[in-house]
A protein has these predicted regions:
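Soluble FAD-dependent oxygen oxidases
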Residues: 2-537
Length: 537
């Protein structure tokens, strides 16, 4: 839409700058968070810094018969893809190319709960390890595994007008499906992430400060447990399991098939993007960390530090999203510029529909819904898909307090360190994304759900990417050293949707005070540990 003429402002608003925002978010699946740019698997787990996943924790279930996959295939309504099948090279892929070496025994594209029961019975009977997958965005590769039976729920993708959504629905389809009825839910921005993994691990997004996490809008869930029972859980039925699924549900208690959400009318939005020269980076980070978490609930923001290899200057930018008025966000970013002490060198401020904003953050502005998918013919993909997979690793921290000057300097030093990686060393990029928390997120009691991170000011994600097919050793070393450098400035907690295999005390980092209760529930609902992976409860 055309904007009215604007007076000169301290943020130096420019026309036609929307392309800047689109370009910055074009890699929406390996950016700041599962809300603005971060991936989360859809029914498994996600996160990590190691180049390859740890070996899976074996199930306690003893095999009682041979693994006859041909018989399993005949018992399913959905398709079972084996290594000899033409679709296997695509079926075995996760979103992150660093796990392309994983070779599951079979991928079952389940069509309903009966298919899931057949697969779980087969796994119990034969001792075949199980992985659960929807979006396939697991940072640790734990939605697949060598010799595993992968239960892919992508076919369970119905988006109902009343807010009931199949566990395998991709976020692009969730937003577009709900928008047809004038509705939405708070969620992430990576279009190919599955709704269930986002929700079951919490679910940060650009509307989270206004509406809460994705899991905070969940009102019911249906799942098939390890013994083949179908349970529908909510505040009245199996309330303990309903509590656990909101923050610790990824791959721990069963195969989720359906989620029901409290929906909201689709709002109008305003987006902003501002960048400064790297010489202003200290002032930008120092000012933003006080400004971002203190804004009204309707204003979300993130600060982003990024560098490429080869000695070039890093970049520093701030993105903001508001459910309020254009003028309110304009005034807010002017106050940020005042705190920084310098106008931004480039700015975009624009009114958008909520649906348009989600497409922009997804990197799908200007393309069709069908194109906003991975290409292919297997469930969850489209033949018109134009999105590409990525190669990266990540780690996270929660900051409960503003960073000290030493903490801010550590962020800048680590960003500059990536620029010293030679261009010839697998390329890629390094980034540090800081997302403002507070608002509706922090008004939920830490005891109300299994997502206990309700008192932090900032979620930090450190991301390293490299050229597909290369080792990325220098990039992963940078990531490890960056996470270590920020440890003393952080709370010790980590975001469970950014699963990190390198964490030793992951139970405390992900689940804090909820860890013991969750462990007891795991024993009750999965006593034989059919659902097992290195960081299973």
């Amino acid at each position: 839409m055309n904007l009215p003429p604007l007076p000169a402002r301290r943020t130096l608003l420019t026309t036609g700058a929307a392309a800047i925002l689109t370009g910055v978010t074009a890699t929406a699946c390996s950016g700041t968070s599962d809300g603005s740019t971060g991936p989360s698997d859809a029914s498994g787990t996600s996160g990590g810094t190691d180049a390859s996943p740890a070996p899976p924790t074996p199930s306690k279930t003893a095999p009682t018969g041979p693994a006859d996959f041909s018989a399993l295939a005949k018992s399913l309504d959905g398709s079972l893809v084996r290594p000899q099948d033409a679709s296997y090279p695509t079926a075995r892929q996760l979103y992150n190319t660093r796990f392309d070496g994983l070779k599951p025994a079979a991928v079952a594209y389940v069509r309903h709960e009966a298919d899931i029961r057949e697969c779980l019975a087969f796994a119990r009977r034969t001792g075949t390890p199980v992985s659960i997958r929807s979006g396939g965005h697991s940072y640790a590769g734990w939605s697949s595994g060598n010799g595993h039976l992968v239960l892919d729920v992508s076919s369970l993708s119905r988006v109902g007008s009343g807010g009931t959504i199949g566990a395998g629905a991709k976020l692009i389809d969730v937003y577009q499906g709900l928008a047809r009825n004038g509705l939405t839910i708070p969620g992430g921005s990576c279009p190919t992430v599955g709704i269930s993994g986002l929700t079951l691990g919490g679910g940060h997004g650009v509307a989270s400060r206004a509406y809460g996490l994705t899991c905070d809008s969940l009102t019911a869930a249906t799942l098939v447990t390890a013994d083949g029972k179908t349970l529908t859980v909510d505040a009245e039925n199996h309330p303990d399991l309903f509590w656990a699924l909101r923050g610790a549900g990824n791959g721990n208690f069963g195969v989720v098939t359906e989620l029901t959400f409290r929906t909201r009318p689709v709002p109008q939005t305003v987006t902003a993007y501002m960048s400064w020269p790297w010489s202003r980076a200290r002032s930008v980070v120092s000012a933003w960390q006080e400004w971002g978490p203190a804004q009204p609930d309707e204003i979300w923001s993130s600060a982003h530090l990024a560098a490429g290899p080869g000695g070039g200057n890093p970049t520093v930018s701030v993105a903001a999203f508001s459910l309020g008025t254009y003028g309110d966000l304009q005034n807010a970013v002017d106050l940020l510029a005042d705190r920084i002490g310098a106008p931004a060198s480039s700015v975009s401020l624009r009114r958008r529909s909520y649906q348009e904003s989600m497409l922009v953050y997804a990197g799908c502005s200007g393309i069709t819904d069908a194109q906003c998918h991975l290409p292919g013919t297997t469930p969850g993909r489209t033949t018109q898909g134009t999105l590409q997979r990525e190669t990266y690793a990540a780690a996270s921290d929660f900051y409960d307090r503003s960073l000290s000057p030493a903490g801010v300097q550590a962020l800048l030093d680590r960003t500059e360190a990536f620029a010293r990686i030679p261009v010839t060393a697998s390329g890629g990029g390094g980034s540090i994304a800081l997302t403002a928390l507070g608002g509706a997120i922090n008004r939920v009691s830490p005891q109300s759900t299994a997502f206990v991170h309700r008192g932090s000011r900032v979620l930090a994600q450190y991301i390293a990417s490299w050229t597909p097919g290369t080792a990325g050793a220098a990039q992963q070393d940078w990531l490890k050293n960056t996470h270590a450098a920020m440890r003393r400035h952080a709370s010790g907690a980590a975001y469970q949707n950014y699963t990190n295999p390198a964490l030793t005390d992951w139970r405390r980092a992900y689940y804090g005070s909820a860890a013991d209760r969750l462990a007891d529930l795991k024993k009750r609902y999965d006593p034989e540990r059919l659902f097992a992976f290195p960081q299973a409860l």
